[in-house]
């Protein structure tokens, strides 16, 4: 969101009324830097507010969502995408309060730039943890089912990693 091609794309979509959905997944940082040093107004949706469609003009629709709120996201995204398809008004989804437990790159730990408070918040509001709690609270699955799914997923990743390494290591 800090580079020219992002802004050019949003501007062109707003001018031409292209049915485009753009999702900005915001964990509060931009390449290891707090967004207050990376984004005007510390919010991409606030910075984009001048692009907001008004009566009788072109532009885009802007939606703010919380990444850990699956039900809330569904309530907003589904009708917004339908509106975008029907009207060709581009939609920008600013998904805030995302967690990123591994940081932005492999060059160093995210613990070097996130405060202890932020790291604790991320443990509590981890999107996967929140989704799991939502599934259980809404009786969409039992604890045992989720444990089995998680175990199967870990095993699948482990086997896929081994298979990829074998292919990489094999002679050409």
Predicted features and spans:
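Glycine-rich ThDP/TPP pyrophosphate-binding loop and its adjacent helix/strand module
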Residues: 2-171
């Amino acid at each position: 969101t800090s580079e020219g091609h992002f802004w050019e794309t949003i501007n062109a979509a707003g001018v031409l009324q292209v049915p485009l959905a753009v999702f900005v997944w915001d964990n509060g940082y931009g390449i290891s830097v707090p967004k207050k040093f990376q984004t005007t107004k510390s919010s991409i949706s606030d910075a984009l507010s001048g692009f907001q469609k008004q009566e009788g003009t072109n532009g885009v629709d802007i939606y703010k969502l919380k990444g850990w709120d699956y039900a809330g996201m569904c309530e907003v995204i589904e009708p917004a995408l339908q509106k975008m398809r029907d009207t060709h008004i581009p939609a920008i989804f600013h998904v805030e309060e995302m967690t990123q437990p591994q940081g932005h790159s492999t060059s160093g730990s995210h613990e070097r730039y996130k405060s202890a408070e932020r790291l604790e918040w991320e443990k509590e509001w981890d999107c996967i943890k929140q989704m799991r709690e939502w599934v259980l609270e809404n009786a969409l699955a039992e604890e045992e089912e989720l444990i089995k799914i998680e175990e199967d997923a870990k095993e699948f990743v482990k086997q896929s990693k081994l298979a990829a390494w074998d292919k990489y290591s094999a002679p050409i």
